[in-house]
């Protein structure tokens, strides 16, 4: 099942990038989707992943996950952005590398969560997929700005999407004793993306609808957490 989750996450990258090529980013106010994704990622981090982690032992790993993705974003310049903003990022290949590294780590995190608790794996996967929608759009826009052809962009998105199953496969080599540390690292990743990347992007201009989107994202995970175990 975890490999199915990983494939779905990869497909979300490809579909989001394809929609950007079709002009979706110019027609839809992505702030609401970004805000919803931020709410989901923060809810999963604080309410699902962190309760599985011993913070007394793994606080440093949590901080390392946060710092690692801060450095990755600043070096690779990968972040949710609008079409006009991405026109200044002439770094197509670097964008693909950054997204691929992020995908690999997310794939491993999804698998580790699944190994600890299949429902936790589902929640992490949900957060990853929703995050990949703005990320896939961003990567596509960056590559368009770098004058890549649509075919080349789709191939790049497809290859980077394969890093999810590859990351999931590597989770099988992580000893059980390190599963909590892996989750702490993923929590740091999610908290950084949700709080330092997605939320600021969603709130470029004050808008109560964006705030509602964030709250809705967190509420959605609460509803999912309540109903899915009953099925």
Tell me what each language-model feature is.
Residues 1-231:
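Intrinsically disordered, metal-sensing/regulatory segments
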């Amino acid at each position: 099942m975890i490999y199915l989750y990983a494939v779905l996450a990869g497909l979300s990258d490809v579909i989001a990038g394809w929609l950007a090529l079709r002009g979706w980013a110019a027609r839809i106010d992505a702030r609401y989707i970004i805000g919803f994704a931020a709410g989901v990622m923060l809810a999963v981090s604080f309410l699902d992943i962190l309760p599985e982690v011993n913070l007394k032992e793994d606080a440093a790993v949590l901080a390392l996950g946060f710092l690692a993705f801060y450095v990755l974003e600043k070096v690779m310049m990968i972040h949710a952005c609008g079409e006009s903003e991405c026109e200044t990022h002439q770094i197509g290949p670097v964008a693909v590398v950054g997204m691929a590294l992020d995908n690999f780590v997310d794939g491993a995190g999804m698998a580790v969560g699944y190994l600890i608790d299949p429902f936790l794996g589902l929640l992490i996967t949900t957060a990853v997929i929703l995050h990949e929608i703005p990320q896939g759009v961003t990567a596509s826009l960056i590559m368009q700005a770098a004058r890549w052809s649509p075919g080349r962009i789709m191939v790049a998105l497809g290859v980077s999407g394969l890093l999810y199953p590859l990351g999931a496969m590597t989770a099988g080599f992580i000893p059980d004793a390190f599963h909590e540390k892996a989750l702490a690292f993923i929590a740091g990743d999610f908290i950084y993306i949700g709080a330092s990347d997605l939320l600021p992007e969603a709130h470029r201009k004050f808008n109560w609808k964006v705030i509602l989107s964030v709250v809705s994202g967190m509420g959605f995970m609460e509803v999912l957490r309540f109903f899915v175990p009953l099925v």
